[in-house]
Regions:
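Solvent-exposed, flexible loop/coil residues
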Residues: 31-33, 52, 85-88, 93, ...
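Acyl-donor binding region in acyl/amide transferases
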Residues: 65-133
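A generic structural-conservation signal
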Residues: 5, 31, 107, 137-138
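A conserved beta-strand-loop-helix scaffold within acyl/acetyltransferase catalytic domains
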Residues: 1-83
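Active-site/acyl-donor-binding loops of N-acyltransferases
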Residues: 108-175
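A short, terminal or domain-edge coil/loop segment
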Residues: 54-65, 83-86, 101-104, 156-171
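Secondary-structure transition/hinge residues
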Residues: 22, 26, 99-102, 136
Length: 175
């Protein structure tokens, strides 16, 4: 397995991994244009890491580095070759970058907040917790709703989409 710091030339590979991860874990992903803007605007303060196994991209992650803090902001992996655990090696390389740039904090960012093994996002918590960090609970996000009817419709559409992804994921696992 090989880990590389790559640029825009590998963004399509990363997006494919994001789509696979989103389908597997039941979450929506941001559009490619979002990641293009992130990589373009943050310059030297952002890195896209990719893991390759037998020449194929099997995992990717985006990390930012600013003000003494390195943040793991996005990660994705293929369904194939999960047994070689590329996400751990990518994390190690990102932690090395944090050390090289004299960061004093490596932030894995958030987890769902529901820390029950039965929750579908528990694996993300287990992965991050495996690095022996601490879980810091912050205030979170606040939204001001200025068009309640439209907001309710969007919330219902998102919930329906999530439910459909869950059903699809369960059907795929049965086959």
């Amino acid at each position: 397995m090989e880990i590389q710091v790559v640029g825009m030339e590998r963004l399509d590979d990363f997006m494919g991994l994001m789509e696979t991860t989103g389908q597997r874990d039941g979450f929506n992903i941001r559009p490619k244009s979002y990641f293009e803007r992130m990589l373009d605007s943050l310059g030297e303060k952002v890195r896209l890491y990719m893991a390759f196994y037998e020449g194929q991209p099997i995992s990717g992650a985006i990390t930012t580095n600013f003000g003494g803090k390195t943040c793991y902001v996005y990660g994705a992996s293929d369904n194939a070759h999960r047994n070689v655990m590329p996400n751990y090696l990518i994390q190690w390389e990102m932690i090395r970058w944090a050390i090289e740039t004299s960061c004093w904090v490596y932030d894995f960012q958030g987890v769902s907040g529901i820390l029950e093994e039965s929750h579908h996002m528990y694996g993300l918590y287990r992965f991050k917790r495996g690095f022996n960090g601490t879980l810091d609970e912050l205030a979170g996000e606040f939204d001001y709703i200025y068009q309640p009817l439209k907001a309710k419709m969007v919330d219902q559409a998102i919930a329906l989409n999530g439910a459909m992804r869950t059903v699809k994921r369960k059907l795929q696992h049965k086959n």
